[in-house]
Every structure is written in C-alpha cells, then in structure tokens.
Amino acid sequence: KFDWGYQSVKQTQLNNRKIYFPRGKALGGSSIVNGMIYIRGVPQDYDNWRQMGLDGWGYSDLLPYFKYSEGSINRKNKFHGNRGPLKVEPARNFSELDKAFIKAAVDSGHEFLDDFNADKRSGVSRVDSTTYLGVRQSSAIAYLKKIPKNLKIFTNTTVSRILFNKNKAIGIETTDG
C-alpha cells in the first residue's frame, strides 16, 4: 500500500535474483519507508560532478543548502544547520551490540568518527537519524507543516508528466484525470 514494489532486472552476478528497491508511495516519498539514516554523499563525488561541467554542484556549492534544510538537534559546527525543517538527532536505537560493533571496528584499525557528515568520511560511527524525539521526520512532516500558498496537493493521484514553460514548471499531467 505504501510502497511502489520496484525490483531490479535479474542480476547475473547474484544468481539471477531480482533486488527489491523500496520506494515510498505517499506524501514524503521514500522518506516514509527508508532507514532514517541522515548521511550526505561524499564531498569528492559532488566535486567530481562540478569538474564534469555541472556548475553549482560541487560540495562547497551544496553545503549551504544541506545546512539550510537541516535542523540538527546536537551538532553545532560548520557542517550542520540547526534551524532547518528536517530535524536530525543521534540515532536512538544504539544498543550494546551497536557499541560492541563499533569497538570491534576500531580495534581492527578503523578510525572512529564523531560525525559522518563532517570532513572525514572513512571510518565507523554512530549515525544521525531523521527523527525528532524518536519520531520519524519524513520530508512531508518537514516541509508540509505550513503548506505554501502556491502549492496544491493532490493525494491518490499519479503524475505522469510535469509541464514546463522554458525552465519553469507550470503544471502537471495525471493518469487519474
């Protein structure tokens, strides 16, 4: 009911199995069914996009937008925002088993990181979560509390195409009439 039920084509390297790709079918999209881990891409990947000609898509270009959207509860540094609509806090499901896993990784030579979204990305850490006081923060919860005047929400409607006038979206086409 809340998942589109997508699967990959058969994967020859995986005994011809199809891989399930959960995708949310509700306001908030996949943020209603994902693992709620808040982790950004590796800065070098964004910088590679910029080097390939995507001006404005380097890490330093995007970091202000990441920070603007983030409402971190506990992080107070140059990599995080604290006033954004998407609330982020340390994952609450941090058990003794999680702690033992991190200790084992550190004992075997992996670096402990305090923050996966800071400047270093290779290591082991407790993750941040898109939750607030233990409640899932979907993109619908984050961005639709105050619905903008220029936004009309259609539920139980499948969009087949976005209509554009040059670079501006001016409407939609639906399969539901």
Describe the function of each predicted region.
Residues 50-169:
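Conserved redox-cofactor binding core of oxidoreductases
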Residues 1-65, 173-174:
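N-terminal glycine-rich phosphate/pyrophosphate-binding loop and immediately adjacent elements
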Residues 167-177:
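Short, intrinsically disordered, charge-balanced linker/junction segments flanking boundaries
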